[in-house]
Amino acid sequence: MDFNIIHSIISITPERPWGLNIANYLFLTGISAANFIFASLYFIFKQKNFKNIAFLALIIAFIFLMVAPLNLIDDLTQPGRIVNVFLYGWENFFTSPMKWGVLLLIFFFFTIFLELYLSYQVVFKQKLKYQKSLFYCSILGFILALGIEFYTAYLIAILTSFIFLHTSIMPILFLISALVSGSGMLILIAGFYIKFFTKEKLDSSLFTTLSKFLACFALLDLIIRIFWFSFLLVFNTEDKFIAQIFFQKEGFFIIFVDMGLCLLLPLIIGFSRLNQKLPFIFLAGCLGVLGSLLFRYTLVIKGQSFPKTTPSFLEYHIDFSNLIGIICNYGLLIALFCLVLAFFNKNILIKGN
């Protein structure tokens, strides 16, 4: 018997249903939802700390939401298939997070668009007759933003065959992780915008506040992950052994890079005197964004690597066409942001007390 043939057969790595595009989609929608929540802190709760950048946060939410679904279309490989998502499967609506997502994305998109219009009229045109409409639109958008994060978490968590993903705390974990990346991205974009597109000086107090928010969310993220991993690795009697093997293989990436570098370090910066120094604040923002992206990558790519019909963990190789699609995705993101700046004539900071 030729054992080389047997070895070749059992070593075939099946292609994952989800790849890098899905991880990027989850990452971008998280930033969009989080920035809408930050804008709502002013438009609903009248938090003065977020007044100057509330409109900027809305723009970030809108642009990231415009670009995010393109990852889903690219992942289908045949864009015409997107029509089937709208036409079929509605009889399974209550048990299909994908169907929830179709409605949530549509309603959230139009809600952000409407809030951009209303807030521009109220804040910059001083048309106070829209104030009440802006308030109610913000409440609706706030609820939809939470729904966006919860639905994407359900997409992952209902995969019962993947033990690393199937946990009831995933919706909360997704929301907190989104707030980490959202606050980090808001720090970076606000700093870049004020530095290069306005004549104003960078207000360290604003960025100190944002770094404290980032640190709080990073702390919550760490606590939830500790609970998650402790149950997975110690108290999950059925699957803890294969989970322990997985952590022996990926532990450095998950514990030291994702949780240590990208969560613990921003936490230290935010809760120490380093939050008064802009370079460290921007470093914390970069790490927060990177950590959330790595978290999504770990869930989607590493989470699907657990063996079911194969004798070992699956290996993932990024397809070149997918990589080009991701690069084009971020190129479009930058182009849309520049277009919005041109449309509003670079006047997107809310003045006054």
Give each language-model segment a name.
Residues 28, 111-276, 284, 291:
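Long, contiguous internal "core" modules enriched in hydrophobic/ aromatic residues
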Residues 21-26, 98-102, 170-174, 237-266, ...:
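Membrane-interface transmembrane-helix boundary segments in multi-pass integral membrane proteins
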Residues 1-45, 67, 301-302, 337-338:
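N-terminal signal-anchor module of multipass membrane proteins
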Residues 10-18, 46-53, 87-147, 152-169, ...:
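Membrane-helix and juxtamembrane interface regions of eukaryotic multi-pass membrane proteins
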Residues 2-3, 73-84, 151-161, 226-238, ...:
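Membrane-helix interface motif
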Residues 279-285, 289-353:
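TerminUS-proximal long segments
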Residues 40, 52, 276-283:
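Internal alpha-helical transmembrane segments of multi-pass membrane proteins
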